[in-house]
C-alpha cells in the first residue's frame, strides 16, 4: 500500500516535479528577439494534509537585453516604460540566477527531481524563460525543457473559463483588473488559481488515485 504521507508530499503529487508559478511581461511575442521586462515566480508547498499552498515569491524588473526589440503595442498594453530608472531593473542573468537558485533549493528541500513551470498560457512564459536563460548562459536551468502545467487549459476543463481574470472569478478568487499585466500580481493570482484547481480535484475524490490507495 502506498504511504499516505508520500501521497500528501509535494514530491509524490506531481511525479517528482516541483511546480513553480511564473509570469513574465515582455515587449512583444517573440522570445528570441523581444525584451523580457518583468518576471515573478511563486513556489508552492503542500501541507501535511496534502493541500497545495503558495510558498515563496520572487519578483524582478528586467533590463532589456542588448539589441532587444521593444514593440510599442506591447509596451502600451502592459504600461511598462523600460527607460524608467525607478523600475530598479536588473539584468536577465541576475533575475534568472536568483530564481533558479531558489528553485533548486526548493527541489532539494521538497525531495523533488526537477522543476516544472506553471503559467497561464504557459508556452509563452516558458519560451521567454528558456530564451533568457540561454542568452544569460545559465547552465543549471532547473526547469523541464518543454513540459509545463497550463492553468488556461486546466481552467477550461474545470471552470469553463480560459481567461485568467474570468477563471479566478469562477473559482471564487478575487481579481483586480487594474493590477492585471503586472507580473507580480498575475503570478500571485495564477498561483492561487492553480492551488484551487489541484485542491478542488482532491476534494472531489480525484486524489489520491483509488489504485494508489489499494496497492
UniProtKB/Swiss-Prot annotation:
Binding-site positions, Mg(2+) 1: 23
SUPFAM superfamilies documented for this protein: Ribonuclease H-like
PANTHER family: DNA POLYMERASE III SUBUNIT EPSILON, RIBONUCLEASE T
Annotated cofactor note: Binds two Mg(2+) per subunit. The active form of the enzyme binds two Mg(2+) ions in its active site. The first Mg(2+) forms only one salt bridge with the protein.
Cofactor(s) this protein cannot do without: Mg(2+)
Name listed for the protein in its UniProt record: Ribonuclease T
Gene Ontology molecular functions: 3'-5' exonuclease activity; magnesium ion binding; nucleic acid binding; RNA exonuclease activity, producing 5'-phosphomonoesters
Entry annotation: catalytic residues: 181
Gene transcribed to yield this protein: rnt
Entry GO CC: cytosol
Site (Important for substrate binding and specificity): 29, 77, 124, 146
Keyword tRNA processing: yes
Upper classification of the organism: Bacteria, Pseudomonadati, Pseudomonadota, Gammaproteobacteria, Enterobacterales
Domain Exonuclease: 20-194
Pfam families the record matches: RNase_T
Matches recorded under Gene3D superfamilies: Ribonuclease H-like superfamily/Ribonuclease H
Record EC number: 3.1.13.-
InterPro entries documented for this protein: Exonuclease_RNaseT/DNA_pol3, RNase_T, RNaseH-like_sf, RNaseH_sf
Family as reported in the entry's similarity comment: Belongs to the RNase T family.
Keyword terms, alphabetized: Exonuclease, Hydrolase, Magnesium, Metal-binding, Nuclease, tRNA processing
Amino acid at each position: 500500500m502506498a504511504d499516505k504521507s508520500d501521497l500528501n508530499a509535494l514530491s509524490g503529487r506531481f511525479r517528482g516535479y516541483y511546480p513553480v508559478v511564473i509570469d513574465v511581461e515582455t515587449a512583444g511575442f517573440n522570445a528570441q528577439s523581444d525584451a523580457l521586462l518583468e518576471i515573478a515566480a511563486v513556489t508552492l508547498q503542500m501541507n501535511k494534509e496534502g493541500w497545495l499552498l503558495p510558498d515563496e515569491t520572487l519578483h524582478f524588473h528586467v533590463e532589456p537585453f542588448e539589441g532587444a526589440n521593444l514593440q510599442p503595442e506591447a509596451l502600451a498594453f502592459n504600461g511598462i516604460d523600460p527607460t524608467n530608472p525607478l523600475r530598479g531593473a536588473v539584468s536577465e542573468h541576475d533575475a534568472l540566477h536568483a530564481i533558479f537558485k531558489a528553485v533548486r533549493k526548493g527541489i532539494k528541500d521538497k525531495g523533488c527531481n526537477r522543476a516544472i513551470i506553471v503559467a497561464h498560457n504557459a508556452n509563452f512564459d516558458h519560451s521567454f524563460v528558456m530564451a533568457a536563460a540561454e542568452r544569460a548562459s545559465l547552465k543549471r536551468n532547473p526547469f523541464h525543457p518543454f513540459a509545463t502545467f497550463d492553468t488556461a487549459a486546466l481552467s477550461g476543463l474545470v471552470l469553463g473559463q480560459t481567461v485568467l481574470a474570468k477563471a479566478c472569478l469562477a473559482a471564487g478568487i478575487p481579481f483586480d483588473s487594474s493590477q492585471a499585466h503586472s507580473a507580480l500580481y498575475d503570478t500571485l493570482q495564477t498561483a492561487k488559481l492553480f492551488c484551487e484547481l489541484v485542491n478542488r480535484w482532491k476534494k472531489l475524490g480525484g486524489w489520491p488515485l483509488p489504485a494508489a490507495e489499494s496497492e
